[in-house]
A protein has these predicted regions:
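Conserved acetyl-CoA-binding loop-helix of GNAT-fold acetyltransferases
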Residues: 101, 107-120, 146
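A short helix-loop-beta-strand connector motif used in the catalytic cores of GNAT acetyltransferases and
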Residues: 58-70
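Conserved beta-strand in the GNAT
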Residues: 70, 76-85, 95, 100
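Conserved hydrophobic beta-strand within the GNAT/NAT acetyltransferase core sheet
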Residues: 96, 130-134
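A conserved beta-turn-beta hairpin within the catalytic core of GNAT-like acetyltransferases
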Residues: 86-96, 106, 152-154
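A short beta-loop-alpha structural element at the N-terminal edge
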Residues: 15-33
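Conserved GNAT-fold acetyl-CoA-binding loop/helix
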Residues: 36-58
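Conserved active-site alpha-helix within GNAT-family acetyltransferase domains
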Residues: 112, 124, 128, 136-154, ...
Length: 169
Protein backbone atom coordinates (compact mmCIF):
# COMPACT_ATOMS: atom_id res chain seq x y z
CA UNK A 1 0.00 0.00 0.00
CA UNK A 2 1.41 3.37 -1.03
CA UNK A 3 1.72 5.98 1.67
CA UNK A 4 1.32 9.62 0.76
CA UNK A 5 2.29 12.67 2.73
CA UNK A 6 0.78 15.90 1.50
CA UNK A 7 2.97 18.95 1.78
CA UNK A 8 2.47 22.68 1.45
CA UNK A 9 5.71 24.20 0.25
CA UNK A 10 4.50 27.01 -1.98
CA UNK A 11 2.89 30.27 -0.99
CA UNK A 12 -0.86 29.97 -0.61
CA UNK A 13 -1.35 32.21 -3.65
CA UNK A 14 0.37 29.73 -5.97
CA UNK A 15 -2.46 27.16 -5.87
CA UNK A 16 0.07 24.35 -6.22
CA UNK A 17 -0.26 21.12 -4.27
CA UNK A 18 2.51 18.72 -3.48
CA UNK A 19 2.72 15.15 -2.29
CA UNK A 20 5.45 12.73 -1.27
CA UNK A 21 4.89 9.08 -2.14
CA UNK A 22 6.77 5.82 -1.97
CA UNK A 23 8.79 5.24 -5.14
CA UNK A 24 7.19 2.69 -7.48
CA UNK A 25 8.77 0.50 -10.17
CA UNK A 26 6.13 1.65 -12.66
CA UNK A 27 7.71 5.14 -12.57
CA UNK A 28 11.34 4.12 -13.26
CA UNK A 29 11.47 5.88 -16.64
CA UNK A 30 10.26 9.12 -15.06
CA UNK A 31 12.79 8.83 -12.22
CA UNK A 32 15.57 8.16 -14.74
CA UNK A 33 14.80 11.34 -16.68
CA UNK A 34 15.04 13.44 -13.52
CA UNK A 35 18.17 11.59 -12.36
CA UNK A 36 19.97 12.20 -15.68
CA UNK A 37 18.98 15.87 -15.86
CA UNK A 38 20.25 16.57 -12.34
CA UNK A 39 23.41 14.46 -12.16
CA UNK A 40 24.67 15.34 -15.64
CA UNK A 41 24.68 19.02 -14.61
CA UNK A 42 26.74 21.02 -12.10
CA UNK A 43 28.20 20.20 -9.64
CA UNK A 44 28.43 16.50 -10.60
CA UNK A 45 28.81 16.66 -14.39
CA UNK A 46 28.25 12.90 -14.73
CA UNK A 47 27.61 11.14 -18.04
CA UNK A 48 24.45 9.15 -17.32
CA UNK A 49 22.19 7.97 -20.11
CA UNK A 50 18.51 7.26 -19.61
CA UNK A 51 19.31 3.56 -20.09
CA UNK A 52 22.08 3.40 -17.47
CA UNK A 53 20.01 5.44 -15.02
CA UNK A 54 17.01 3.13 -15.49
CA UNK A 55 19.19 0.09 -14.88
CA UNK A 56 20.64 1.61 -11.70
CA UNK A 57 17.29 2.73 -10.33
CA UNK A 58 15.49 -0.51 -11.15
CA UNK A 59 18.30 -2.64 -9.69
CA UNK A 60 18.18 -0.63 -6.46
CA UNK A 61 14.39 -0.71 -6.25
CA UNK A 62 14.23 -4.48 -6.67
CA UNK A 63 16.28 -5.17 -3.54
CA UNK A 64 14.30 -6.13 -0.43
CA UNK A 65 16.08 -3.46 1.63
CA UNK A 66 15.12 -0.55 -0.66
CA UNK A 67 13.29 2.48 0.69
CA UNK A 68 12.61 5.52 -1.46
CA UNK A 69 10.37 8.56 -1.74
CA UNK A 70 9.27 10.71 -4.68
CA UNK A 71 8.04 14.29 -4.49
CA UNK A 72 5.42 15.58 -6.92
CA UNK A 73 4.08 19.12 -7.28
CA UNK A 74 0.97 19.49 -9.42
CA UNK A 75 1.58 15.90 -10.57
CA UNK A 76 5.07 16.73 -11.89
CA UNK A 77 8.05 14.84 -10.46
CA UNK A 78 10.29 17.27 -8.57
CA UNK A 79 12.58 15.01 -6.52
CA UNK A 80 13.55 11.50 -5.48
CA UNK A 81 15.50 10.08 -2.57
CA UNK A 82 16.41 6.49 -1.80
CA UNK A 83 18.66 4.16 0.07
CA UNK A 84 19.18 0.64 1.35
CA UNK A 85 18.51 -0.56 4.88
CA UNK A 86 21.44 -2.46 6.40
CA UNK A 87 21.65 -4.44 9.61
CA UNK A 88 24.57 -3.43 11.83
CA UNK A 89 25.54 -4.72 15.27
CA UNK A 90 23.89 -1.68 16.87
CA UNK A 91 20.71 -1.47 14.81
CA UNK A 92 19.46 -0.81 11.33
CA UNK A 93 21.28 1.85 9.33
CA UNK A 94 20.47 3.23 5.92
CA UNK A 95 22.94 3.93 3.16
CA UNK A 96 21.43 6.97 1.46
CA UNK A 97 22.38 6.25 -2.14
CA UNK A 98 20.74 8.90 -4.27
CA UNK A 99 18.94 12.18 -3.68
CA UNK A 100 18.07 14.73 -6.33
CA UNK A 101 15.70 17.62 -6.91
CA UNK A 102 14.92 19.09 -10.32
CA UNK A 103 17.51 21.80 -10.91
CA UNK A 104 14.95 24.57 -11.51
CA UNK A 105 13.20 23.67 -8.23
CA UNK A 106 16.26 23.61 -5.96
CA UNK A 107 16.53 26.04 -3.02
CA UNK A 108 12.75 26.11 -2.54
CA UNK A 109 12.51 23.67 0.37
CA UNK A 110 11.64 20.60 -1.68
CA UNK A 111 14.84 18.73 -0.84
CA UNK A 112 14.42 19.43 2.86
CA UNK A 113 10.81 18.20 2.73
CA UNK A 114 11.85 15.05 0.89
CA UNK A 115 14.67 14.33 3.34
CA UNK A 116 12.33 14.90 6.31
CA UNK A 117 9.76 12.54 4.80
CA UNK A 118 12.38 9.83 4.40
CA UNK A 119 13.66 10.43 7.94
CA UNK A 120 10.09 10.09 9.22
CA UNK A 121 9.63 6.77 7.42
CA UNK A 122 12.98 5.54 8.72
CA UNK A 123 12.07 6.51 12.27
CA UNK A 124 8.87 4.46 12.01
CA UNK A 125 10.87 1.32 11.18
CA UNK A 126 13.58 1.87 13.77
CA UNK A 127 16.48 3.01 11.61
CA UNK A 128 19.12 4.46 13.93
CA UNK A 129 21.67 5.94 11.52
CA UNK A 130 21.89 7.41 8.01
CA UNK A 131 25.17 7.49 6.14
CA UNK A 132 26.01 8.68 2.65
CA UNK A 133 28.81 9.42 0.22
CA UNK A 134 28.79 12.73 -1.62
CA UNK A 135 31.06 15.05 -3.54
CA UNK A 136 33.05 17.65 -1.66
CA UNK A 137 31.77 21.20 -1.85
CA UNK A 138 29.18 23.54 -0.44
CA UNK A 139 26.39 22.56 -2.84
CA UNK A 140 26.74 18.90 -1.88
CA UNK A 141 28.62 18.38 1.39
CA UNK A 142 27.41 21.76 2.66
CA UNK A 143 23.79 20.83 1.99
CA UNK A 144 24.00 17.82 4.30
CA UNK A 145 26.01 19.67 6.96
CA UNK A 146 23.21 22.24 7.23
CA UNK A 147 20.79 19.39 7.90
CA UNK A 148 22.69 17.80 10.78
CA UNK A 149 25.01 15.41 8.95
CA UNK A 150 28.65 15.36 10.05
CA UNK A 151 31.81 13.97 8.49
CA UNK A 152 32.89 10.76 10.17
CA UNK A 153 36.13 10.94 12.13
CA UNK A 154 36.65 7.19 12.02
CA UNK A 155 35.71 6.39 8.41
CA UNK A 156 37.32 7.11 5.07
CA UNK A 157 36.13 6.60 1.51
CA UNK A 158 38.64 4.71 -0.60
CA UNK A 159 38.44 3.74 -4.26
CA UNK A 160 40.45 1.53 -6.57
CA UNK A 161 40.14 2.30 -10.26
CA UNK A 162 40.93 0.17 -13.29
CA UNK A 163 41.75 -3.01 -11.41
CA UNK A 164 39.93 -5.16 -13.95
CA UNK A 165 41.51 -5.46 -17.37
CA UNK A 166 38.91 -5.50 -20.11
CA UNK A 167 39.46 -7.35 -23.32
CA UNK A 168 38.04 -6.27 -26.64
CA UNK A 169 35.89 -8.83 -28.44
Amino acid sequence: MEKEAFIDLYDKDSNKTGKITDMELSHVAEYAELFVSVFNAEPWNDSWTIETAQIRIENMMRTPTFIGKALYVDNALIGIIWGQKEQYYNGIHIHLQEFCVKTSEQNKGFGSALLKALEGALSEIGVSNIYLITSKGDKTEGYYSKRGFVSSDNMVLMTKHSFCKRTEK
